Swiss-Prot record:
Organism encoding this protein: Spodoptera frugiperda
Record carries keyword Ribonucleoprotein: yes
Similarity remark: Belongs to the eukaryotic ribosomal protein eL32 family.
Domain of life: Eukaryota
Entry's transmembrane regions: none
InterPro entries associated with the record: Ribosomal_eL32, Ribosomal_eL32_CS, Ribosomal_eL32_sf
GO MF term set: structural constituent of ribosome
PROSITE patterns: RIBOSOMAL_L32E
A UniProt-annotated Pfam family: Ribosomal_L32e
Protein's recorded name: Large ribosomal subunit protein eL32
GO CC list: cytosolic large ribosomal subunit
Cleavable signal peptide: none
Key words of the record: Ribonucleoprotein, Ribosomal protein
Length: 134
C-alpha cells in the first residue's frame, strides 16, 4: 500500500507562466531567463501597461503549500541510509529523493531501507540495474 500524506491541500500557483527578459524576443544574444531591468528609461522597470510583468513578492505561493509536490509531500535530498532514517517519524509529511551522485549499489540499499521504514522515494527506479544485465 502506498504511503499517503497527512493532508493534501489544493496547491494554487498564482502564476505558472515564466517571467521573460525584456527584449529577449528581439535579440538572439539575450536569453529568455529573467534579468531585472535597471535602465533609467526602461518601461518594464517603470511598469508601463502592456509590458512584460516583473516578478515580485505578490506572486509567492501559500506558505502551507510552498515547496510541496503535487502528491502532497515535501522532498528531502538523501545521500545515505543514515539521512533516510531522519525521516522515519515524518514519513507522512516528507518523502526522500536520492541525490544524483549516489551509486547504484547504495541506491539499492536506500530504496530497500525506505520500504522497511515506509518512506516514499520519488526517484526509486533511477539507476537500478535489472538482473538480466548483470
Amino acid at each position: 500500500m502506498a504511503i499517503r500524506p497527512v493532508y493534501r491541500p489544493t496547491i494554487v500557483k498564482k502564476r505558472t507562466k515564466r517571467f521573460i527578459r525584456h527584449q529577449s524576443d528581439r535579440y538572439d544574444k539575450l536569453k529568455r531567463n529573467w534579468r531585472k531591468p535597471r535602465g533609467i528609461d526602461n518601461r518594464v522597470r517603470r511598469r508601463f501597461k502592456g509590458q512584460y510583468l516583473m516578478p515580485n513578492i505578490g506572486y509567492g505561493s501559500n506558505k502551507k503549500t510552498r515547496h510541496m509536490l503535487p502528491n502532497g509531500f515535501r522532498k528531502v535530498l538523501v545521500h545515505n541510509v543514515r539521512e533516510l532514517e531522519i525521516l522515519m517519524m515524518q514519513n507522512r509529511k516528507y518523502c526522500a529523493e536520492i541525490a544524483h551522485g549516489v551509486s547504484s549499489k547504495k541506491r539499492k540499499t536506500i530504496v530497500e531501507r525506505a520500504q522497511q521504514l515506509s518512506i516514499r522515494v520519488t526517484n526509486s527506479a533511477a539507476r537500478l540495474r535489472s538482473q538480466e544485465n548483470e
